[in-house]
C-alpha cells in the first residue's frame, strides 16, 4: 500500500509543472501589458467622445444663437450652393438641369411659401440640416489642424549700427599754411620798408665834370 501511495505522489508531482520565480514574473508582466493596452484604448475612446461632444456642443451653440429667420436663410444659401456646384461640376442630363433650375427659382423667389421651399430642399439634399452640421464639423477640424501645424516664428529685430567716420586733420594744416603766408607777407613788407627808408649817401669821384656836347 505504501508503495502505491508513493507511486501516485510521484505521478502527481510529475504532472504539476514546477512554479519558478521567472514564470511568476512573466505572468505579472503579461497582466501589466494587458492593463496598459486597456487603459490606452479607454483613453483614445474618451478623447474621441470628448471631441464629438465638443463639436456637437459648438454646433448647438451656433444654432441656438441664430434666430429662426437667420437659420432658414443659412439653410437656403447652403442648398442653393450645393445645386450650383452640382450643375457646374457634375455631368447631368437636360432633364436634371431643368429640375435643378426650377428648384433654384423656387428657392430664390421671395413669393414662394416656406413649406414649398422646405419640400424642395428635402427633395434635393435629403436631411440638409444634418449635412450642414457635418460640413461645419469638417471645417472646424481643418481649422484646428491648420492651427496646430502652423508654427509662429519670432523675427529678430534689426539692431541699429552706428559707424564713425574718420575725421581728417585739415584745420591745423590750413592754420600752418595761413601762418606761413602771413610770415612771408610780413617779411616782404619789412624788406620793402627797409629798402625805402635807406638814407642817400653821396660818393665823391675823382673824374672832372664836363658837358658832353659835340662842338
UniProtKB/Swiss-Prot annotation:
InterPro entries: DUF4615 (IPR029274)
Biased composition (Basic and acidic residues): 40-63, 167-178, 188-199
Residues in the signal sequence: none
Region (Disordered), start-end ranges: 1-72, 87-111, 158-199
Pfam family, one: DUF4615
Entry superkingdom: Eukaryota
Biased composition (Basic residues): 29-39
Assigned protein family: Belongs to the UPF0488 family.
Protein name, as recorded: UPF0488 protein C8orf33 homolog
Amino acid at each position: 500500500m505504501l508503495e502505491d501511495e508513493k507511486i501516485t505522489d510521484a505521478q502527481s508531482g510529475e504532472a504539476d509543472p514546477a512554479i519558478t520565480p521567472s514564470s511568476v514574473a512573466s505572468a505579472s508582466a503579461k497582466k501589466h501589458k494587458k492593463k496598459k493596452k486597456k487603459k490606452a484604448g479607454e483613453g483614445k475612446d474618451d478623447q474621441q467622445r470628448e471631441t464629438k461632444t465638443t463639436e456637437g456642443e459648438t454646433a448647438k451653440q451656433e444654432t441656438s444663437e441664430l434666430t429662426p429667420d437667420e437659420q432658414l436663410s443659412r439653410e437656403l444659401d447652403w442648398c442653393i450652393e450645393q445645386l450650383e456646384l452640382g450643375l457646374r461640376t457634375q455631368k447631368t442630363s437636360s432633364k436634371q438641369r431643368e429640375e435643378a433650375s426650377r428648384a433654384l427659382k423656387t428657392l430664390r423667389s421671395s413669393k414662394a411659401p416656406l413649406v414649398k421651399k422646405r419640400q424642395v430642399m428635402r427633395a434635393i439634399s435629403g436631411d440638409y440640416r444634418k449635412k450642414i452640421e457635418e460640413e461645419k464639423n469638417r471645417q472646424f477640424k481643418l481649422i484646428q489642424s491648420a492651427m496646430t501645424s502652423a508654427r509662429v516664428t519670432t523675427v529678430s529685430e534689426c539692431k541699429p549700427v552706428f559707424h564713425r567716420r574718420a575725421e581728417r586733420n585739415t584745420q591745423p594744416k590750413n592754420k600752418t599754411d595761413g601762418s606761413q603766408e602771413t610770415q612771408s607777407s610780413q617779411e616782404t613788407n619789412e624788406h620793402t620798408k627797409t629798402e625805402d627808408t635807406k638814407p642817400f649817401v653821396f660818393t665823391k669821384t675823382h673824374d672832372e665834370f664836363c658837358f658832353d656836347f659835340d662842338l
